[in-house]
């Protein structure tokens, strides 16, 4: 999320009884036998608890890949199109593999189901002698918190020259579209997900927006896509 949308989500969660302790980490837990009763924060404050969930991000388990002599950074380095590793006979896909974000070229772990599926299909095809490749990977997420629908995609915190955005905000909704070089490269949608599919397709397809008829914020439509793309989407992705 960006800063404004994060504040909206936080306010909504606090309304439902959640409390935030920002900028703090848990330094230790106080237990009675095997039961956690309290945790101590970095600032010395103690919080009672019935259940302690530890969640500080994910890191791929790469010990096997390293033992096999594969090139590993934060994850296993692969060809982003074929998923071939530094060993030509070994392929990697999914959360263990470093992805290349198609929108800015950065290398990162994109531990998301759609990316894992695309990479797995490409790796399987390549190992079987086929030529299927990964079309491109990027971040996309959708979640619901107590009825607050949140969708994000692409470069939502991009900064620097060449990036612009459009924002529409209300008390319980938020829409932000991020642009670069005349194309949509990211969005944040909160209680405004009606056109999420079209926005995602505009991003993944790299569709130029110049000269398009209609308001992108309120009324994007399939006629903005090339004819062959429109036909495929209307047929549910099946080529007839």
List each model region and its residues.
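A short, polar/charged loop-to-alpha-helix boundary motif
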Residues: 193-210
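A general beta-strand register signal
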Residues: 21, 40-41, 77, 144, ...
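Rossmann-like dinucleotide-binding cores of NAD(P)H-dependent redox enzymes
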Residues: 1-28, 112-116, 134-142, 147
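FAD-site-proximal beta/loop scaffold in flavoenzymes
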Residues: 32-40, 45-125, 211, 217
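Cysteine/selenocysteine-centered motifs that mediate thiol-based redox chemistry or coordinate metal-sulfur cofactors
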Residues: 209-240
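Aromatic-rich beta-strand edge motifs centered on tyrosine
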Residues: 29-33, 178
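Mid-to-C-terminal Rossmann-like scaffold of FAD/NAD(P)H-dependent oxidoreductases
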Residues: 96-197
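Generic secondary-structure signature for well-ordered alpha-helical cores
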Residues: 14, 18-19, 31, 70, ...
């Amino acid at each position: 999320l960006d800063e404004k949308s994060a504040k909206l989500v936080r306010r909504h969660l606090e309304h439902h009884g959640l409390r935030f302790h920002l900028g703090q980490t848990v330094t230790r837990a106080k237990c009675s036998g095997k039961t956690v009763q309290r945790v101590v924060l970095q600032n010395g404050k103690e919080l009672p608890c019935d259940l302690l969930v530890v969640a500080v991000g994910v890191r791929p388990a790469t010990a096997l890949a390293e033992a096999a002599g594969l090139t590993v950074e934060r994850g296993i380095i692969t060809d982003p199109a074929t998923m071939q590793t530094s060993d030509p006979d070994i392929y990697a896909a999914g959360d263990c593999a470093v992805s290349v974000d198609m929108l800015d070229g950065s290398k990162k772990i994109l531990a998301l189901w759609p990316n894992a599926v695309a990479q797995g299909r490409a790796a399987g095809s390549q190992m079987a002698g086929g030529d299927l490749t990964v079309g491109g990977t990027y971040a996309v997420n959708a979640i619901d918190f107590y009825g607050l629908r949140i969708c994000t995609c692409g470069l939502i915190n991009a900064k620097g020259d060449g990036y612009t955005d459009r924002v529409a905000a209300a008390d319980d909704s938020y829409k932000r579209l991020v642009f670069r070089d005349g194309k949509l490269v990211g969005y944040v949608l909160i209680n405004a997900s009606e056109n999420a599919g079209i926005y995602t397709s505009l991003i993944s397809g790299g569709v130029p927006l110049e000269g398009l008829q209609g308001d992108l914020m309120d009324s994007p439509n399939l006629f903005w896509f090339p004819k062959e793309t429109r036909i495929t989407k209307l047929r549910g992705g099946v080529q007839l």
